[in-house]
Amino acid sequence: MQKIRKGDKVVVLSGKDKGCSGEVIKVNPKENKAFVRGVNMVKRHQRQTQKQEAGIVSKEAPIHLSNLAIADPKDGKPTRVGFRMNVDGNKVRFAKRSGELING
């Protein structure tokens, strides 16, 4: 089970976007990287196709998972993630800062 998943709210811990938060769009577990909406934006030159015209497009670049932390559901501050068994016997994630369950 992964600590950071698609749809999670995360906070960037280091780099040019330190302190910024956003939603995880995509996670690549083999490379230990994730794409976060609106964070780590880079400009790419787009070649013209039949569907879209040429130009410079801003898109998200991947961020290493070690530079991300889950935002605590209670106050939005970065927290570590723990795992515990639910009453149903399912493994669930929880915020170590507040003890709140992380949905997903």
Swiss-Prot record:
Keywords, in A-Z order: Ribonucleoprotein, Ribosomal protein, RNA-binding, rRNA-binding
Give Gene Ontology CC terms: ribonucleoprotein complex; ribosome
Which stretches are transmembrane?
A: none
Say which domain of life the source belongs to: Bacteria
One Gene Ontology biological process: translation
The record's similarity note reads: Belongs to the universal ribosomal protein uL24 family.
Q: How does it assemble?
A: Part of the 50S ribosomal subunit.
Please give the name of this protein: Large ribosomal subunit protein uL24
Task: Kindly list the organism's lineage.
Answer: Bacteria, Pseudomonadati, Pseudomonadota, Alphaproteobacteria, Hyphomicrobiales
